[in-house]
């Protein structure tokens, strides 16, 4: 970039590439791959001399100062001062270009006219509405008529640890703002008195693919990442992983395969809530709203739900506007919803859209670019353009 293309802007490293790796692969820590034998300061020095200006995820000045001293010893103080000033110019240039030094103070009146500006808020909210996908609408239950009485079960969230190692206690609470729901519908805690049930769940969460207990029991530590709630055994996984094991934290492990291992989603209670709600509602309709961060295997509950909505990080009001008909769904699936975990395991990493997509009880295929509006399956210029599938792997 610096020599061939003449780039003189800021180059920032990926996060934590100068830090040491965690003790186990599931620990979100350093990624000093290829330079594990160097000290932290030596890694900084190598990055600086390669032409980078900024260290992603590193707030410690000590290793940078040590790297400077290394450079002085090898190249002299004048050369290292010039190298540091070169990065300083690149970094400060961006600050000067937006006037932060010349005009560091905000005009409060001007800010209030910009921040929270109605037209900006409307644009953001409209974007949320346009991202919500209606997957199933049996008998055209949706939109719900005004005055309907809804039952919304509480959602159980088990104690869990996220990717960064942060822990959260278990909780049982309503998954949406009930005061907001009451502005749209009548609400009851008794399913027998409800016209319809509205169940809010999150997509299956089976963890990050590594389990210390598996390692302690003699395994390699790697377990499946499942897209279904119920227990899944990886019978169709590779016997030998593409990745070459853990050369740093565990050199004895040369295979990350999880073939034959079983995992269950931490939030399997979401599936139980759907099924229990259907049993409580008997013949009355159940609407499932899934907040997704990955595709999901909906075969476990699809037949028990009259309606299924998929969302990707929207506020409660947007979902309620769709359910109530204040807004019509127009979004298309940005992913395939797999028929089962077998097709997930067998898909090719370099070929998009090569999974077997789920077909629901209404005959609709939850493929890439599928979605419903109030009239039925959406067929427009978007579906004409995006429902094309590549046939072969990339070379």
Name these PLM-found stretches.
Residues 4-128, 346:
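Active-site or pore-adjacent capping/gating segments
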Residues 4-6, 12-21, 37, 64-78, ...:
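C-terminal non-catalytic regions of proteins with extracellular/luminal or membrane-system context
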């Amino acid at each position: 970039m610096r020599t061939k293309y003449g780039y003189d802007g800021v180059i920032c490293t990926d996060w934590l590439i100068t830090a040491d790796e965690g003790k186990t692969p599931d620990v979100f820590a350093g990624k000093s791959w290829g330079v594990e034998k160097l000290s932290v300061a030596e890694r900084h020095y190598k990055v600086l001399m390669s032409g980078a200006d900024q260290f992603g995820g590193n707030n410690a000045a000590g290793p940078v100062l040590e790297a400077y001293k290394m450079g002085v010893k090898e190249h002299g103080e004048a050369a290292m001062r010039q190298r540091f000033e070169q990065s300083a110019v690149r970094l400060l240039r961006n600050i000067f270009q937006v006037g932060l030094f010349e005009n560091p103070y905000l005009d409060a009146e001007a800010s209030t006219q910009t921040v929270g500006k109605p037209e900006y808020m409307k644009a953001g909210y409209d974007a949320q509405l346009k991202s919500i996908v209606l997957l199933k609408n049996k008998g055209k239950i949706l939109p719900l008529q005004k005055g309907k009485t809804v039952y919304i079960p509480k959602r159980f969230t088990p104690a869990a640890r996220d990717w960064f190692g942060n822990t959260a206690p278990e909780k049982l609470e309503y998954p949406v703002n009930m005061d907001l729901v009451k502005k749209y519908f009548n609400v009851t805690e008794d399913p027998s008195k409800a016209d319809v049930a509205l169940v809010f769940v999150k997509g299956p969460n089976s963890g990050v693919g590594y389990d210390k207990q598996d390692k302690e029991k003699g395994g390699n530590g790697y377990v499946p990442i499942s897209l279904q709630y119920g227990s899944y055994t990886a019978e169709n996984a590779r016997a030998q992983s593409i990745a070459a094991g853990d050369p740093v934290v565990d050199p004895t492990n040369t295979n990350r395969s999880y073939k034959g291992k079983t995992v269950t989603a931490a939030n399997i209670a979401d599936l139980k809530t759907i099924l229990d709600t259907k049993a409580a509602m008997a013949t009355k309709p159940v609407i499932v709203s899934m907040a997704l961060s990955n595709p999901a295997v909906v075969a476990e509950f699809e037949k028990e739900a009259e309606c299924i909505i998929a969302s990707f990080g929207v506020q409660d009001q947007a979902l309620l506007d769709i359910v109530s008909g204040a807004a019509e769904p127009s979004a298309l699936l940005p992913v395939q919803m797999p028929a089962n975990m077998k097709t997930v395991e067998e898909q090719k990493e370099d070929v998009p859209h090569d999974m077997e997509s789920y077909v629901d009880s209404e005959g609709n295929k939850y493929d890439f670019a599928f979605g419903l509006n109030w009239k039925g399956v959406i067929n427009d210029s978007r579906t004409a353009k995006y429902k094309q599938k590549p046939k072969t792997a990339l070379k």
